Structures are given as C-alpha cells and as structure tokens.
Amino acid sequence: MEAPAARLFLLLLLGTWAPAPGSASSEAPPLINEDVKRTVDLSSHLAKVTAEVVLAHLGGGSTSRATSFLLALEPELEARLAHLGVQVKGEDEEENNLEVRETKIKGKSGRFFTVRLPVALDPGAKISVIVETVYTHVLQPYPTQITQSEKQFVVFEGNHYFYSPYPTKTQTMRVKLASRNVESYTKLGNPTRSEDLLDYGPFRDVPAYSQDTFKVHYENNSPFLTITSMTRVIEVSHWGNIAVEENVDLKHTGAVLKGPFSRYDYQRQPDSGISSIRSFKTILPAAAQDVYYRDEIGNVSTSHLLILDDSVEMEIRPRFPLFGGWKTHYIVGYNLPSYEYLYNLGDQYALKMRFVDHVFDEQVIDSLTVKIILPEGAKNIEIDSPYEISRAPDELHYTYLDTFGRPVIVAYKKNLVEQHIQDIVVHYTFNKVLMLQEPLLVVAAFYILFFTVIIYVRLDFSITKDPAAEARMKVACITEQVLTLVNKRIGLYRHFDETVNRYKQSRDISTLNSGKKSLETEHKALTSEIALLQSRLKTEGSDLCDRVSEMQKLDAQVKELVLKSAVEAERLVAGKLKKDTYIENEKLISGKRQELVTKIDHILDAL
C-alpha cells in the first residue's frame, strides 16, 4: 500500500470517530503505528502481552496536535482482560503510567481505551509507548483430562497482528512458551523456532483492525492455581493494631485428573503429577506478627515461616496436593502495627494499605471482596484507589464494648492479577474523645456491678421476718468472734513458751520479763473482749454464755500454769532448782496444762 493511499484510508477511517480529548480540531489527528514489537509470554497460566509501539503523527495537512490515542482489544480476548497499562518507553514505570479510560467507538465491536499522552504530539512527531496487557483463563487444557502420570498440554488462540484502530507499518511478534515441547503452531509468515521461542514477522503495511488467528498447542506444567473467591478483612484499631484475615478458596484450573490418585507413585516418582501443586509461597508484610494458617479441620502445621528484611515469607502446604479440578479452602491471618499504615492530622485519618496482597506467584483472583472495619465513630469515609473498584453499601460490625457499631467498607473486584497489588487510601474523620468510650464503659460496668452487689447484700428479700432465725444468726456471729479470740489467746501461750526456752538458753532475764509483760497485756485485752462477747450472748438469751464462762475459768488456770512454768525456769537458771527436779515439775505442769487445753477444745467444739 502506497503512503498517500494509506493516509487517505486512515483519514476516512478516523472520520467516524469522536475527536480525541483535548484536540484542537473537530477531527481526530491522523496517527499510525510506525513500528510494533510484540512479546507474548505464555510461560505460566497467564497470557502476558507486551507491545512496544512507535506512534507517529502523520500530519497530512492537519495542524491539530494529538493529545491522546486509542487502544483496541480483540473481541475474542476482551472478556479475559485483567490488566491494561501504558507508559512511555524508557521512563520510570511508577511515575509515568499514562491515564487510560475506556471508551466506545460507534459501529465497532470489542473494547476501546483512550490513552492520554504526557505531551501533545505535533504533526510529524513520534513517541514510543509500551502497552502491557494480562489475560486470564485464555490457556485451555487440551486434552481436558489427564492421568496422574501424564503431562499437561494447553492451547492458546490469539492474533498474529497487533489489533489496533490505526494502520501499522511494520510489526513483529515473539512468543515465549513454557517448554520446548510444542505439538503444533500456526505458520503465518514462516516463523522461526528456537527452544521455547517462536518469532513471527516482520509483517508490513498491516491495515487497522487486522485479525489472523494465531494458535499454539504446547506443554505447560506450570501451576494453574486460581483463587476462585477471596475475602480480605482489615480491622483497624486506634490502640495500635491492625488485624488482617484472608479467607481463600483455591482451585487447580488445569487439566482435570482422570482416574485414581496414587500417593505411593506420587512420592516415589519425581515426574508423577508434574502439573500438580504441592505448595506455594505467600509474601506477607515485613511487620506481620502473630501469623496463623488454618483450614476447616484446624491449624495446619505443615506451613513454614521465614522472616526476611523486607517481608515475611510463608510457605503454604495444603493437606493434600492439588490436581486439576481439585479445590481447597484456608484462612491466613496476622497483625500489623498501626503506626506503619495509619496516619492522622488532628481528627483527619488516612489508612494506606494494599487492596490485595501477594498470595502466590502469577496469582489469579476471580472474585475478591475487601472489608475494612474502621473504629466506632468514624465518619466522612472516602476511598482513593489506583484502579476502578466496586463498592457495596457500608455495613456495621459489632464486637466487645461497641454501642452503635463499627462502620465496615465493603469493596469488591473481579479478575485480579499481581499488577493489582497496589495501595488504596481510606480517608475518614474520627473524634479522639471517642477513644475514651470503651475504658469508660468498662469502669461504668464494674461500678454498676459493685453497686448492685452492695445493694443486694443490704436488702432483705424475705417475705416475713423470723426473730428466732435472726437471733441464731447473731449468736453464730458472736460465737465465731469468740473462737477467733480464743485461738489468739492460745497463740500467746505458745509464743511465751518460746520466750521461756530462749531465756533458758541465753539466761537473759530481760527477755523473760519482756515476754511476761507482753503476755499480761495482750492476755488482758483478749480476755476483756471475750467477756464483752459473753455479756452479749447473755443478752441474746443463749445458753452458750455459761460455756464461755466455764472456758474463761479454765483459761485462767492455764495462764497460772504457764506463769508457774516460767517461775520454775527462773529457779533452774538461778541454780535454786536441780535439773532433774525441774524436769519432773515441768512434766506435771505440762500434763495439767494439756488436760485443761483438752477441756477448752471440747467447749470450743460445742460452740
């Protein structure tokens, strides 16, 4: 096709489109793909297509500058698109991703996107851009069923040409496969094959919207692992912690296992179940702690955790290997310090976290639901996302000490890949006074509890009063006090016995005198208290008064014996009494004292 004819054809074609945003004229500027180098990566279960496009402004009498250009996707692949990104070649990827917006072209099928250029393109000027697309579920297993010992083969169908609304002068295509074992592939333009690479082209003067089926059938044993459903829950606490939990449903979407599964062959033969999945690695944030991994049965102990400088690597090994068509479900959770992800200025808060995190290499997520539980009282909630997400109505979540519920943001998205591992920012306002709500609730709850107990024990809930029962309760209370005082008085005697023994060893008369004085003082006080309690028993008309009186008399005799024992010890130390005589006298005193104490014990038991 000659150049003037090509330009005329292009102008007629572009005349049916709406003008590009920012165009100076009512007609779209005439553009052409001067050179296209496509790379189709089929080495995993994803189809990654990267195109380096040299876009040229033809001019052709038009003085309008091009501020944007159009991208098109084949109707056969448009439904499988997971990611589309465009950037200027040679510039930093993160800072120079171009703005892409979906649009429609009247009379044309497929999906179209408008890409805004960083700088308007003058007539005759050129710009090199890189277009990256990722497709999911486009590699179809063929055969669809295999045995445990067979290898997996897949079929991919695409386009030999770069599908574009603009004509293309020259283009090439390189296909990277998962292995060198290729059953068949299309032969358009006599492609060259080297190991696991197929090279097509160059194709010259390709008209716009050109399509020619490209098909390849080859061996691909990479893990066809797909997350069919995933729920990611992020619970934010202003007390320093962010809890993350992920509920994951996994499925092997490769060729379905045909026939029985042999664990013996699987362990013995290295190539048995070569396309199955034994384990995979999940990358958690570097600050992750308290990590757990469980399924429906419980904790799975076959997992391993490796803490690195910039991440935490978790090897997840399901309870059984995954073959084609097999499914499993598991839960992973961990805690994060909030100071790394939560920022605030006054009452303004911003939570910056990933919408989806790394689950495994070359991940595919069919359906993702993200729930972000904010603190109770959060208001004016807004979300900034690097890509389009859908929002469901906000929910309320109730947990300990909540009164009106915590707001829950519910967002979801379908067909996600690794390129979607990006941060979202949740903005909200929160009155810091509300942080005192839960501590005050705890204090109030304990106050009410103690106050209720106090009131309860002081109230009389009996229907009729029983004077006899009240009298018995009073007598029992007085008796309990008498028992306590008697035990203390017996303890005084034992303490004085120890003082006498120390005196016999040290011969220090001051020690003995001090012990006597202490015994007299404390014994007098205890005896007086018991006498008062005895009078109260008499007032209540209890017959226990006589028993207490008898016990007092017996105690007086015990005291005399205790003091007599001290006198004997003084005579022994002074040399006025022989040791043999002292031992005989001490035996007599101890025997009488034991008889008296036994009688007192009987009286106490009767009380």
Curated annotation (Swiss-Prot):
> Where are the annotated coiled coils located?
none
**TM segment ranges:** 435-455
Which parts of the sequence carry N6-acetyllysine? K187, K538
- One biological-process term from Gene Ontology? protein N-linked glycosylation via asparagine
Q: Hey, what's the signal peptide range on this chain?
A: 1-23
| Cellular component, GO, one term | oligosaccharyltransferase complex
Q: What does this protein do?
A: Subunit of the oligosaccharyl transferase (OST) complex that catalyzes the initial transfer of a defined glycan (Glc(3)Man(9)GlcNAc(2) in eukaryotes) from the lipid carrier dolichol-pyrophosphate to an asparagine residue within an Asn-X-Ser/Thr consensus motif in nascent polypeptide chains, the first step in protein N-glycosylation. N-glycosylation occurs cotranslationally and the complex associates with the Sec61 complex at the channel-forming translocon complex that mediates protein translocation across the endoplasmic reticulum (ER). All subunits are required for a maximal enzyme activity.
Give the bilayer topology. Single-pass type I membrane protein
InterPro entries named in the record: Ribophorin_I (IPR007676)
Q: Which family does it belong to?
A: Belongs to the OST1 family.
- Topological domains on the Cytoplasmic side lie at 456-607
Report the pathway entry.
Answer: Protein modification; protein glycosylation
- Mainly resides where? endoplasmic reticulum
User: Hydrolase: is it a keyword of this entry?
Assistant: no
Lineage, uppermost ranks: Eukaryota, Metazoa, Chordata, Craniata, Vertebrata
The cross-link described as Glycyl lysine isopeptide (Lys-Gly) (interchain with G-Cter in SUMO2) comes at K538
Q: How is it modified after translation?
A: Ubiquitinated by the ECS(ASB11) complex.
Q: Which residues lie on this side of the membrane: Lumenal?
A: 24-434
The places in or outside the cell where this protein is found are: Endoplasmic reticulum membrane
Q: Which residues are glycosylated?
A: N299
What keywords sit in the KW lines? Acetylation, Endoplasmic reticulum, Glycoprotein, Isopeptide bond, Membrane, Signal, Transmembrane, Transmembrane helix, Ubl conjugation
Q: What protein name applies here?
A: Dolichyl-diphosphooligosaccharide--protein glycosyltransferase subunit 1
